[in-house]
Amino acid sequence: MSSLDRLRALLGKPVTWGWARPRLWTTSEQYLGVELPSDYKAFLDLYGPGSIDGYLSLSRPLEADATELERLWSLEDWRWSRLSAPDLYPYPFHPDPGGLISWGSDEHGSEYYFLAIEPNPDEWRIVVGSECNSWFETAGTFCDFLVRCFDRIDRPPFMDRAWPTPDARYHSHA
């Protein structure tokens, strides 16, 4: 069973989404200058923007206009923060080479990223930065990471220990 299939079994059928919009991903990828991981796009094509149990929020393009692309993908503020305090930010931020690309955030202020150092986006690592500047890095795809969170293995030590609950559901924000 693929990790996406496992997430479907864990989260249940999407309530309001469930369709692909390739043009929106193409526009985002043109804005970023890189392709995004295929399982990330597949998950968000299935479930849409929303959150898992209100804890982990995930965004995706809905219109792909300039304002939305900037809101979703720009990390300029983080890039400047890294320049002024490099010890607090051990990773570069996109569009710097090998920079982090944001894909989510949680209710405790942690930010979730792809570490875009491999030529193949399906081989990118996952990085999580906490609001206290603790960092966690792991291998595996987007869906693999979410499954491991459910299995409570190889997940950030600063992640809420009670999340996800066994009856976790995806809550659409669309």
Which positions does each model-derived feature cover?
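Compact, glycine/acidic-enriched structural inserts
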Residues: 135-156
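Short, surface-exposed beta-strand/loop micro-motifs that present aromatic residues
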Residues: 111-118
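A surface-exposed partner-binding patch
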Residues: 1-108, 158-163, 170-174
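A generic structural signal for beta-strand entry/edge sites
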Residues: 100, 121-123
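Short, surface-exposed beta-strand-loop junctions and turns on beta-sheet-rich folds
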Residues: 120-121, 134
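Short loop/turn segments at secondary-structure transitions that flank enzyme active sites
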Residues: 109, 121, 151
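Short polybasic amphipathic segments
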Residues: 123-129
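Short acidic/polar capping segments at secondary-structure boundaries
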Residues: 106-109, 131-134
